[in-house]
Amino acid sequence: MNDNHNNVNSIHQFKTQGIDGTEINFKNYEGRKILVVNVASECGLTPQYAQLQELYESFQDKLVIVGFPANNFGGQEPGTNGEIQTFCTKNYGVTFPLAAKIDIETHPIYRWLTSKKENGSIDSSVEWNFNKYLLNESGQLVKYLPSSASPIDETIVDWVNS
């Protein structure tokens, strides 16, 4: 992980551990839009996994989705990395990258995403599972959407196509 997150103007400067133990290097996603979403397996919004997968399959050439499992809200992601990965694959056919389980409040990427001082664009707070952060092809944060926003909402689809 990149703990030197001050004055980082692009998510492309970050790396994190994948749910399978491999590294997710955001630099590999240069030239594609990125949707970052905090996810949970026991939330009323968990069916959004299916919509995220649909979005990913429809736009893989220009969009990457990275899910960050976290147990910060209502204890709704109690599983281990292995249990989460199995759940997502078995129930939703998830093929987009999933990070290893994190703590939203302390993870460097989420500190960067939520602080305008650090990302240069938007102040936000992660208030529940399935909050969405949209980043452009240069890795700059351009939009934040709350949990209630469907991954296949026209706001997101139009943004991907723009």
What residues fall within each predicted segment?
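N-terminal "domain-start" segment that seeds a small globular fold
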Residues: 1-27, 47
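Amphipathic alpha-helical repeat scaffolds
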Residues: 18, 38-42
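Conserved helix-turn-beta segment immediately C-terminal to the redox Cys motif
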Residues: 31-33, 42, 46-71, 89-92
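Thiol-based oxidoreductase modules, predominantly thioredoxin-like and allied folds used
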Residues: 38, 62-79, 94-106
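Short, internal strand/loop/helix patches
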Residues: 82-129
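Thiol-/selenol-based redox modules, centered on thioredoxin-like
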Residues: 111, 115-162
